[in-house]
Amino acid sequence: MAGAPLIRLEDICKTFHNGDLAVEVLHGITLDIRAGEFVAIMGASGSGKSTLMNILGCLDTPTGGRYLLDGEDVSTLNADELATLRRRTFGFVFQSYNLIPTSTAQENVEVPAIYAGTPAAERRKRAAALLNALKLGDRLDHRPSQLSGGQQQRISIARALMNGGRIILADEPTGALDSQSGEDVMELLRSMHQQGHTVIVITHAREVAERADRLIEIRDGQILSDTTKRDIHTPEATLQPHEEIAGNGAHIADISEAVKMALHALRANIFRTVLTLLGIIIGVSSVVTMLAIGTGAQNTILDRINAMGTDLILVRPAMAGFRGSGSIATLVPQDADAILELPNVKSAVPEVTGTVTLRRGNVDYQSQANGTVPAFSSEIVESRQRQLHHPERYRYLRPCGWLGTTVVKTLFPDGGNPVGDYILIQKIPFQIIGTLEPKGAGFGGSDQDDVVVVPLSTGNLRLFGQKYVRSITVQVKDSSLIDTTQNQIQSLLDQRHKKRDTMITNMSSVREDAAAMGKTMTVFLGSVAAISLLVGGIGVMNIMLVSVTERTREIGVRMATGARRRDILLQFIIEALSVSAIGGAIGVILGLGAAALASWAGLSVGYSFGPVLLAFACAFATGLIFGFLPARKASRLLPAVALSSE
C-alpha cells in the first residue's frame, strides 16, 4: 500500500510510577496504521491495550519512543495542541458511553462542535441529523438515564462523528451491550469505515476483533501478532482533518458557551447551588445593610453638627493639670463683650448651665437650665412667642424664661398654652414668656428640647449663685476665616487672664473629626460584614472542589472531545462567577430591602451607589479568587486519568 502511514508508532514505551515503584506497561511498540483501515487491537485485561489506545488517541503521552500522526511528531505538542489534534482528528466511542448525565442526547452530541467553535445553529442542525441517521430522532431531548445502553452507545457514536471523526477509536464498544445492540454497533463501525473513516477497535473479545480487516494482538505490553484477515479495502477518498472557525468570533463563542454550560451545570444540582448562593447572599446583603446604616449614622451626626452651625466657635474654661472645667471661675460675661469687638465676630453669647428642679402644680421635673443673653434667643434659638421677648428681661435678675418642648409636654400635659403662666425653678417663681422650636436629639443623643432658658444674670445669681460662665459661643461673619478668628480669641483671653485657662474649638474642626470618625465606623461595620462574605467565598471554593471531584469523568469527556485547558478553566471559573454574581445581585436587593426596613423602623440610613457597587464587586472578586483553584485543578487533569475515574 503506497504512501506514508496515517499513524506510525516507533518503539513506544509507557511507564507508570506509584511512589518509588515504576511499572512499564508498554514495551517498545512499533506499529503502522494507514488511512481508511479497519483495525482491531485485541488483548486480555492488563495487556496494555487501553494504555495503547490512550496514546493513539492523544489522551496520554508515551514515556519513550515516537508517535507520528500524519507525519507530525505528537510528542512535541503541548496540552492545548494535543486537544486541538483530538478535536480535529479523533472520535471516541467508549464502553461506558461517557455521556454527560445532565445533558440531553442532542447536547451530548454537540460537545465536540462547541470546542471547535461551530455556530450554535449549525451544530444543532448537524447533531439532529446524526441522531436521525442513527434512528434516535425522537430522543433528542432525552437524558442518558432515560435511554437504553444501545441508544446511549449510538449517541456516543454520533458524538464521535460530530467533528468528522477522521479516526474513530472504539474502546470495548460492545462490552456493555446485549448481543443485538452489539451487532448493531459493529455494523455502524463497518459503515463508518466504508465512508472513509479510519476505525480502530480496542477489544478483548475475539468475535468482535474478527469483524475487523486487520487484527493486532497484544500481550504484556508487546505486540504478539499482526494479522491481515482479508484484503484491506481502503476507500478511495479518506477523510481530512476537521476545519474550525478562528479569530475573535471563536473567543466570543468560547465565553458564550462557557456561560451557558455553567448555568446548565448549576441548574442540574439546584439544591446545592442554592446552599452555595446563601453564603454569598448573606455576605453581600450584610455589607450593603451595614454600610447603609453606617453611612446614615455618619450623615445624621454631620447634619446635627451642620444644624448647630459650622460658623461657631466654642470657648470653655480649661487648664492643664486641672480637673473639672466647671470649677474654673475665670471665664466671665465681660470676656464675651471683649470677643465681640474682634473684626470677624458676629455675636458672642455667654452661657451658664446646670441641672434644676422644675415644679408646676404637683408635677416635679428635673431639667437643664441655660442662662444666656438676648443674642442666644435672637441668633441661635428660634422662639415661637416673641411678644414678651425683650432685651430688658435679661437684666435686673428678672425671673422669666423659655421652655423647650419636652419640658412643656411634661409640665403642661393638657396641651394648654404655657406663655404667661408661672412655674417654680429651684422653688423660685418664674414667668414663662416663650417656647423654643423643637430641636430633637443633639450630638451624642442628648435631648435638646429638655431645657429652660433664662436670662444670664438670673441664672448666675438666682439659680446657680455664681458670676462666671460655663461657655461662650462665638458666631463668625466669614467661615473661611474661622481658624484665624479662633487664634485671635485665644490670644485675647490669654492676655485678659494672664494665663492659658481656656479651651477653644470650632464646629468646622468638630465636623471634620466627626466625619473621620463616621468613616472609620462605616469601614468597621463594612469589615465585619465582609467576614460573612469571605465565609461565603470559602463555601464557593468548597462546592467547586466537590463539583470538580464529582465531574472528573465529565472533564475527561470534554478533554477527549477537544476541550483545551483554558476551556475547562474558563468553564469552572464562570460557574464560580455565576454563583457569585447571582448571589451578589440577590444580596444587593435583600441588603437594600433590609436597609429600607431599618429606615422604616426609625434608623438613619444612607443610600449610595458606591457601597452597592463595592459589595457586588467584592462578591464577583470572591467568585474569581475562590473559584480559580478548583478551576485550575480541573484544567490540570490528564484526559486518560479523568476518564478512568469512578
UniProtKB/Swiss-Prot annotation:
* Keywords annotated in UniProt: Antibiotic resistance, ATP-binding, Cell inner membrane, Cell membrane, Membrane, Nucleotide-binding, Translocase, Transmembrane, Transmembrane helix, Transport
GO CC entries: plasma membrane
Q: What membrane topology is annotated for this entry?
A: Multi-pass membrane protein
Q: Which domain of life is it from?
A: Bacteria
Transmembrane segment boundaries: 274-294, 528-548, 572-592, 609-629
Q: Which InterPro entries match?
A: AAA+_ATPase (IPR003593), ABC3_permease_C (IPR003838), ABC_transporter-like_ATP-bd (IPR003439), ABC_transporter-like_CS (IPR017871), MacB-like_ATP-bd (IPR017911), MacB_PCD (IPR025857), Macrolide_Exporter_MacB (IPR050250), P-loop_NTPase (IPR027417)
GO BP annotations listed: response to antibiotic
Q: What is its EC number?
A: 7.6.2.-
Q: Which residues bind ATP?
A: 43-50
- Ranges for domain ABC transporter come to 7-245
Pfam families, alphabetically?
ABC_tran, FtsX, MacB_PCD
| UniProt KW Transport keyword | yes
Q: Where in the cell is it found?
A: Cell inner membrane
Keyword Amino-acid biosynthesis annotated: no
Gene Ontology molecular function terms on file: ATP binding; ATP hydrolysis activity; transmembrane transporter activity
- Oligomeric form and interacting partners: Homodimer.
- Would you identify the family this protein belongs to, as annotated? Belongs to the ABC transporter superfamily. Macrolide exporter (TC 3.A.1.122) family.
Q: Which PANTHER family does its entry note?
A: MACROLIDE EXPORT ATP-BINDING_PERMEASE PROTEIN MACB, MEMBRANE COMPONENT OF TRANSPORTER-RELATED
What's its job? Non-canonical ABC transporter that contains transmembrane domains (TMD), which form a pore in the inner membrane, and an ATP-binding domain (NBD), which is responsible for energy generation. Confers resistance against macrolides.
Task: Supply the name of the protein.
Answer: Macrolide export ATP-binding/permease protein MacB
| Native source organism of the sequence | Brucella abortus (strain 2308)
